[in-house]
């Protein structure tokens, strides 16, 4: 159901195109990420969520900003699809572009303050910033390689998307789903409610089962956990960029059966294009289904649906 693609293989662009036209999800192996960097980021996430609650709340997301700690039960992702559900059973910590990038970008467009807000770092973990910044940069480089393969799969030049993502507004999010052995969920409650992602591409590393996607049959399907692989899914922006040829698929994280109700951890890299990049159809032989829109405006319109 969810194809596994070796990124370096010659047939990768064609296989990516096929996956994105159908399920909108695939997994990549042979991605070349440094396992030392990956392990350091994973440990950093574990260390952060193990902090006392007061230390985590000290770096809570400031009002009007995008990055920092999101407490347990603070988010309802399904609200983005208009669903009224109980809050999600997870806690998060998100980081955005570096302070240097943020300062430069804000001088050009104050309207971008949300995506270019500063990341608050916990003083109790002084090594956290270096570990996560290195991982953030490595994942951004991987997405650039991935989007080159995607461009080829769409019949475009390999560097087609590069000018639109060289000052990307991406976010790295650590997610912790606490142990649910002794917790009884409310009706309709999820670890993460059904939603689609807003940006171009999402990369996900996960520790255990629970992620489900809507298949072409309309049913929910499990995404298997494959050691060393990254789950990739298409976001709303890339769906629009491809004139809806590719699917931004609804997905969720469910509460598993009693055998797998222990804690779960994942790290997601939500890649977004440059704030001022213009999203318009790259499919030359079809009439555009959507008017052109800046990536920044598109992203903010999506965020506002959950406020």
Residue ranges with predicted function:
Residues 1-307:
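Peripheral, non-catalytic segments flanking oxidoreductase cores
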């Amino acid at each position: 159901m969810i194809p596994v693609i070796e990124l370096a293989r010659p047939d990768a662009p064609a296989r990516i195109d096929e996956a994105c036209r159908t399920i909108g999800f695939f997994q990549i192996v042979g991605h070349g990420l440094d396992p030392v960097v990956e392990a350091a980021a994973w440990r950093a996430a574990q260390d952060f969520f193990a902090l006392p609650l007061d230390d985590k709340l000290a770096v809570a997301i400031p009002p009007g900003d995008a990055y920092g700690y999101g407490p347990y039960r603070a988010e309802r992702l399904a609200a983005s699809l208009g669903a009224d559900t109980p809050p999600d059973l997870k806690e998060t910590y998100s980081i955005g572009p570096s302070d240097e990038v943020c300062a430069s970008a804000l001088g050009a467009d104050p309207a971008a303050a949300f995506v270019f807000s500063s990341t608050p770092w916990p003083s109790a973990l002084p090594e956290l910033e270096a570990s996560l910044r290195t991982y953030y940069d490595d994942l951004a480089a991987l997405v650039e390689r991935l989007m080159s393969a995607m461009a080829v799969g769409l019949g475009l030049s390999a560097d087609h998307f590069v000018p639109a993502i060289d000052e990307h507004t991406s976010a790295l999010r650590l997610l912790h789903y606490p142990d649910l052995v002794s917790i009884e969920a409310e009706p309709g409650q999820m670890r993460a409610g059904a939603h689609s992602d807003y940006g171009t591409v999402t990369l996900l590393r996960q520790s255990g089962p629970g992620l489900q996607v809507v298949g072409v049959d309309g049913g929910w399907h499990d995404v298997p956990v494959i050691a060393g692989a990254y789950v990739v899914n298409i976001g709303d922006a890339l769906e629009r960029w491809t004139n809806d040829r590719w699917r931004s698929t609804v997905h969720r994280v469910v509460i598993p059966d009693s055998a797998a109700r222990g804690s779960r951890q994942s790290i997601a890299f939500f890649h977004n294009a440059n704030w001022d990049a213009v999203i318009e159809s790259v499919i030359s032989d079809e009439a555009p289904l959507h008017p052109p829109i800046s990536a920044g405006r598109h992203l903010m319109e999506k965020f506002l649906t959950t406020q």
